[in-house]
């Protein structure tokens, strides 16, 4: 059974006339009237402000009707004709223009017929990515920057939608795993549900260690996560095949959690981690007083990280190094680098995730026919 929504505004009599015409043609239809208050601009408001007020009043009314379950929505007032395309762009529910191409208002009978025969198939929804941000703040900005740079767009409008649920107060993931500190599960879950409620299509997390908790919340979230470790390991396999000898530089929490190690083992790729001395230097590069989380990207933190990289290459013959904490790419760049006299590829999981997100978004846009 079709449900038609009508925005009443200041035109109650017209709305009732249209409703009566609809029911006279098809009594099985449900007609919802939105009689929410319309904000009135000040008497001395500019024409631009008055028109913006009309747009926003109608936008809010359409949103209420869509939430109430309307399949198609019409207007008792003819003014939405002036900004009809702009209004329709913001919704997947079908709207019906109250006027003909010339701008003349349709009669109640003609408009009722237009509403009754309107296609109720929702318009395709633009792809939207949700990011749980604040893990940490600089890594969040870094991932977003890499997504923007990886997107082959020539105009602002060719980029896809992305929402960041920024919550730097999410408890420290490494402390939880290593010291029994506050658990971030509920904070991350709350962020994920907010992104789901905001109509996102997928969720990304700009923190390697946080992925240890993603598996705990994933079953309770209705949209998929794009897993940073998975896409990183897939890129390594595609690039190096069975020639890859991988070294992992990450937080001790990530190392012990097996986020990368388990995937490497399942894919048949050897992976090594630093010894205790060099793992301590990796942690210092991240958490130390002159580390990345303190805002440093050169000097002592670079020396610490380079020392761990050299250990992995010299001791285990690694030819691929994973920057397995999202702060580490702030210190070392992705790409080929000579370490201990050997050419080694440094892969940034943040960049790998950005590339995959762009690919998924482009494929969705092509399938849906809308950005």
How should these model regions be labeled?
Residues 1-371:
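Non-catalytic structural scaffold of enzyme domains
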């Amino acid at each position: 059974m079709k449900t038609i929504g009508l925005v009443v505004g200041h035109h109650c009599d017209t709305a009732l006339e249209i409703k009566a015409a609809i029911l006279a043609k098809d009594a099985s239809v449900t007609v919802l009237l939105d009689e929410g208050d319309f904000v009135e601009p000040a008497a001395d408001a500019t024409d631009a402000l008055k028109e913006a007020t009309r747009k926003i009043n109608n936008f809010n009314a359409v949103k209420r009707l869509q939430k109430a379950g309307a399949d198609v929505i019409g207007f008792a007032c003819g003014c939405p004709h002036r900004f009809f395309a702009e209004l329709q762009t913001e919704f997947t529910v079908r709207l019906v223009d109250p006027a003909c191409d010339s701008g003349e208002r349709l009669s109640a009978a003609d408009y009722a017929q237009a509403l009754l025969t309107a296609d109720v198939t929702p318009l395709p929804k633009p792809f939207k990515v949700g990011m749980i941000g604040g893990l940490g703040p600089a890594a969040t900005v870094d991932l977003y920057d890499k997504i923007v740079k990886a997107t082959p767009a020539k105009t602002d409008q060719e980029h896809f939608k992305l929402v960041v649920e920024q919550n730097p107060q999410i408890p420290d993931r490494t402390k939880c795993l290593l010291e029994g500190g506050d658990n971030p599960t509920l904070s991350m879950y709350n962020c994920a549900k907010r992104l789901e409620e905001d109509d996102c299509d997928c969720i990304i997390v700009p923190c390697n260690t946080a992925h240890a908790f993603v598996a705990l919340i994933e079953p309770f979230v209705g949209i998929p996560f794009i897993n940073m470790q998975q896409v990183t390991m897939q890129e390594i396999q595609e690039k190096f095949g069975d020639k890859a000898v991988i070294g992992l530089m990450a937080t001790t929490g990530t190392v012990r959690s097996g986020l990368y190690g388990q995937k490497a083992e399942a894919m048949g790729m050897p992976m090594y981690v630093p010894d205790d001395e060099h793992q301590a230097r990796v942690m210092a590069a991240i958490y130390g007083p002159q580390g990345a989380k303190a805002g440093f990207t050169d000097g002592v933190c670079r020396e610490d990280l380079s020392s761990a990289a050299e250990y992995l290459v010299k001791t285990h013959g690694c030819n691929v190094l994973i920057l397995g904490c999202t702060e580490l790419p702030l210190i070392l760049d992705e790409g080929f680098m000579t370490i201990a006299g050997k050419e080694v590829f440094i892969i940034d999981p943040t960049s790998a995730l950005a590339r995959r997100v762009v690919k998924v978004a482009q494929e969705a846009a092509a399938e849906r026919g809308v950005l």
